[in-house]
Amino acid sequence: MAFKIASSPHLSRSFQTSSLMQRVILCALPGVAVQCFFFGWGTVIQALLAMSVALLSEAVVLKLRARNVTDTLRDNSALLTGLLIGIAIPPLAPWWVTVIGTLFAIVIVKQLYGGLGHNIFNPAMAAYVMLLISFPVQMTSWVAPSVIASQPVDFIHSLQMIFTGASSSEINAYKLGFDGISMATPLDTIKTDLAMGLTTTESLSKAIFSDGFGVGWFWVNLAYLAGGLVMLKLKVIRWHITAGILAALFICSGVGYLLNPDTFTGPLLHLFSGATMLAAFFIATDPVTAATSVRGRLVFGALIGILVYIIRTFGGYPDAFAFAILLANLCAPFIDHYMKPRAYGHRSAT
C-alpha cells in the first residue's frame, strides 16, 4: 500500500475569504428565489440595489483611506452584506431606505471600525435595526404572498413603486389578501391578535396561516435551510452556532406552548416563520462578530435563540433576530473569555 507523504502543517485547506463569501452567496440563492416567487420581483430589485450601493460605497471609503480598492472588493464581503440587507427589507420599500441602510452598514458599521475583521457588530443586522427604528412604516410594509394576493406585483410595477413611489391607496391595494384584510407577516399577525385578546388558535385560523405556518414563509425558511445544510456539507460554516440557536428556540417555545397553548405559539411556527433559518445559517454564523471557541459558539447560539424567543413573545418586535444577534455580538468577547478551551496540563482555561 502506498502512503502519501507530505510535510507539515498537516491541516485541511481552509477557504480564502473571497471563496467563502462566494459560497455563502450561492447557497443563499435558493432562498432568495423562493422569496422572490412568493413576494415578487421587489426582493431581487432590493438585493441588486443594495449590493451595488455596497460595492460603490466600500470603494469610495477605501479610496479615501488610501487602501487597495480592487483587492478588497474581491473578498466579496460587501456583496454578501448588500445581499442580506436587500432580502431583509420589504420588497416594495422605497429605494432610499435600501440606500441609507446599505451606506450605514458599509461606511459606519464596517469601515469606520477598520474594515472586514475589525467590526464588532454584524453590518447587515445593525443596518436593519437602524432602519426599523428610523423608518418603522416602510420597514413593516410587507406585501401579501403572491398565491393569495388580490393583485400580485409584476416586475415593472415593482420597479415603479420602489423608485418612483406610490400612493397609500396603491400600496394598500397590493397589500390586500384575498380575504380583504391588509396583510402582515405571520409573526406580526399573531402579535397583533394576541394583543387584541385572541388566542393563538383563533389567530392561526386566518388566511395567512392556510398552510399551517404562514403562507410563503414556510417554504422560504425551508429553502434557506437547504442552502444552510449545503454550507455545512461544504464546511463553509460550523454547526455549533446554528444548533445552539435552533435548539434554544425549540426548547423555549416548546415549554411555553406546553404551559399555555392559547397564548404561546408552538416550536414549528417559530422555526419556520420570519427569518429563522436565514439568520441561523447565514447571519449569526459570521465568524468576525461571533464567539470563537467550540463551547463559546454553542453558548453564543443558545443566547441568540433565547433572546429571539423572549423578544418575539414579550417584546415589541415580532421577528427579533436582528436585535438578538446584535446583543449576542456585544457578549461575544465575554463568552470567549469564559469559554476558552482548557490548556493541556492546566486545571482551567482561566
From Swiss-Prot:
Organism: Shewanella sediminis (strain HAW-EB3)
Recorded family membership: Belongs to the NqrB/RnfD family.
E.C. code: 7.-.-.-
Pfam families per record: NQR2_RnfD_RnfE
PANTHER family: ELECTRON TRANSPORT COMPLEX PROTEIN RNFD, ION-TRANSLOCATING OXIDOREDUCTASE COMPLEX SUBUNIT D
Membrane topology: Multi-pass membrane protein
Location(s), subcellular: Cell inner membrane
Function: Part of a membrane-bound complex that couples electron transfer with translocation of ions across the membrane.
Name assigned to this protein: Ion-translocating oxidoreductase complex subunit D
Transmembrane regions: 25-45, 89-109, 129-149, 212-232, 239-259, 264-284, 298-318, 319-339
PTM-bearing positions, type FMN phosphoryl threonine: 185
A GO term from the CC aspect: plasma membrane
Biological processes per GO annotation: electron transport chain; transmembrane transport
Cofactor(s), by name: FMN
Subunit structure: The complex is composed of six subunits: RnfA, RnfB, RnfC, RnfD, RnfE and RnfG.
Lineage: superkingdom: Bacteria
Keywords, sorted A to Z: Cell inner membrane, Cell membrane, Electron transport, Flavoprotein, FMN, Membrane, Phosphoprotein, Translocase, Transmembrane, Transmembrane helix, Transport
Classification via InterPro entries: NqrB/RnfD, RnfD_bac
